[in-house]
Design a protein with these regions (language model features):
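Chalcogenol-based redox active-site neighborhoods
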Residues: 1-154
Length: 154
């Protein structure tokens, strides 16, 4: 998994709207949150929480992108259903998840499987990781990320 002071990969990913290129957003802070599956309870709550704080993130010159393995069409339905404002990346080939180290072995009811570990990366204007949240607990998380951005300053 990427760590503080690592440079983020200069990835390009399809979203439900258009391709998202990290290189187009250098000069802004970037929040990248990885979530397991669109339109499930925790992922919905997390995405709505970031949407509810969108104006505050915008004022701090910060772009937000949520990434899951869902295809762009599913991300589009997810956006429309909940009026989400953050970018939604479709990593259905698992390239970005692997680059960030969030594609991990998980276990549920004794069954092991591979999946996305809910994680968030805060990057500065140069694309350097400044904070990492692993195994994110959704309640209060978006607020915590916003506070970390404020602490980074301009």
């Amino acid at each position: 998994m990427l760590k503080v002071n690592d440079e983020i990969p200069r990835f390009e990913i399809l979203t439900d709207k258009a391709p998202f290129k990290v290189s187009d957003h250098i000069g802004k802070k970037i929040v990248i949150f990885f979530f397991p599956k669109a339109d499930t309870s925790g992922c919905t709550a997390e995405s709505i929480a970031f949407t509810n704080l969108q104006k505050e993130f915008d004022q701090l010159n910060c772009i937000i992108i949520g990434i899951s393995k869902d295809k762009p069409q599913k991300q589009a339905k997810f956006r429309e259903k909940y009026n989400l404002t953050c970018e939604l990346g479709a990593d259905y080939e698992n390239n970005v998840c692997e680059q960030f180290g969030v594609w991990v072995e998980k276990s549920m009811y004794g069954r092991k499987y591979m999946g996305i570990q809910r994680s968030t990366f805060l990057c500065d204007e140069e694309g350097i990781v400044k904070k990492v949240w692993e195994k994110v607990k959704v309640p209060g998380h978006a607020d915590e990320v916003l506070e970390a951005i404020r602490e980074l300053g301009n």
